[in-house]
């Protein structure tokens, strides 16, 4: 529907009026042959009833419509119009092409979003503020949160039950596998081969690393740091069968003779450059796997590997 003519200053050219609603053209389009112009909404509604021009009755369809000429758009944009919110106290008169941007910020707009300053902080249309009740709103929020918490607790209980069932299934499966292995030693060899291939695949997915500050090694990481490194190992795809072993081997109490004490590490530091190390993603830590370090002496490596954590100095080899 077009704009009410009474909102405009001065006379409006008849060519700028919609023949259907008699208002000033809004989002105007024109018929291609007769060139009569209409509001887009008006002509769309008209075509829902009949496929002819409402002025000269020539055949025309929605697909035939075209934008109006630039000169008509320029004439429309220069018209001076009063604000939609004049009835609410706005006295602004502005160009038609500036109306929409003005309406977004017009302080007299009854639907302009405002924030309650009485404590609840709810954002609502300005005309709803007089009937707003903070306590009622907050009570509704609390009820919604309680419902959401109840749903989450129900979901968590279901997941816990499913996890317990899965753990029982795993234990039964492990017992079954042990029974089969005891009856067929070849199956145990096959399982070990599969596990070894999984370890190799994971190790090959890690980025090669270089340690530039061996003196920054943290040889006695606390439980929190070990938990952080363990999470990173799991996230990187480390086979679960070796995660705990690697974390056990992150502390000097489990290290081989060549790394066991600070004095020994200082004496052997020149050999550490021979380690094939892979970076634990996102951490100042490396994993030194036995399968990649067979060239190192037995006093320098452990099965399945070592985790070395540093304060700084771990770089990826690109």
UniProtKB/Swiss-Prot annotation:
Pathway(s) where this gene product acts: Protein modification; protein ubiquitination
Function: Acts as E3 ubiquitin-protein ligase and regulates the degradation of target proteins.
Stated name of the protein: E3 ubiquitin-protein ligase NRDP1
InterPro entries: NRDP1, NRDP1_C, Znf_RING, Znf_RING/FYVE/PHD, Znf_RING_CS, Znf_SIAH
Organism for this UniProt entry: Danio rerio (Zebrafish)
Origin organism lineage: Eukaryota, Metazoa, Chordata, Craniata, Vertebrata
Top-rank EC class of the record's enzyme: transferase
Keyword Zinc-finger: yes
Zinc finger (SIAH-type) stretch: 78-138
Zn-finger segments (RING-type): 18-57
Keyword match Zinc: yes
Record-listed E.C. numbers: 2.3.2.27
GO molecular function: ubiquitin protein ligase activity; ubiquitin-protein transferase activity; zinc ion binding
PROSITE patterns: ZF_RING_1, ZF_RING_2, ZF_SIAH
Annotated gene: rnf41
Catalysed reactions listed for this entry: S-ubiquitinyl-[E2 ubiquitin-conjugating enzyme]-L-cysteine + [acceptor protein]-L-lysine = [E2 ubiquitin-conjugating enzyme]-L-cysteine + N(6)-ubiquitinyl-[acceptor protein]-L-lysine
One Gene Ontology CC term in the entry: endoplasmic reticulum tubular network
Alphabetic keyword roster: Metal-binding, Transferase, Ubl conjugation pathway, Zinc, Zinc-finger
An example Gene Ontology biological process: extrinsic apoptotic signaling pathway
Pfam families: USP8_interact (PF08941), zf-C3HC4_2 (PF13923)
